Amino acid sequence: MRGLRLARQDALEKIFALYAACVRWMNEVSIHQWNDTDYLSAYPPDDYADMQRRGLLFVLEGENGALLGAVVLLPEDERWNGRPSRRAWYVHNLVTAIGASGAGKAILREAEKLAKPHGMEVMRLDCADDNTRLNAWYESQGYFPCGTCIDGPYNGILREKLL
């Protein structure tokens, strides 16, 4: 796998296709998260185009140039309001290609590497509170629970990793 890099505008269609494929896969394997929250309407292609223009959308590619995953790294997140203030990047919209073993772990590690030279102290993310498998995976990656959030129908666990 190549390192994480800023997404180019010409990759936006392929990036959004990853999210659509992930939602279909969740339906097929009965995982209830993005597919139950109208995710593709909540985060339409224009949102990703905006994140790309702002330098917040990143991609992970394979050695052959194939798109393996994408992530948005935000400098702030209102779900964390009222929490201890630390210099943080907020991981959002992390997606991997179906079958791209190790891509999610690689995205997190590469994002963490990028964060340090920018003076970040922590990486933060949230995960649906009823997705026990994904919460366990995030914990295995060093992202520990430190609170909860509610955003409309979404109930999440706030997770943080010290860098």
Predicted stretch roles:
Residues 101-113, 136-140:
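Conserved acetyl-CoA-binding loop-helix of GNAT-fold acetyltransferases
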Residues 2-18, 24-26:
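A short beta-loop-alpha structural element at the N-terminal edge
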Residues 59, 66-75, 90, 95:
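Conserved beta-strand in the GNAT
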Residues 115-127:
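Conserved GNAT acetyl-CoA-binding A-motif
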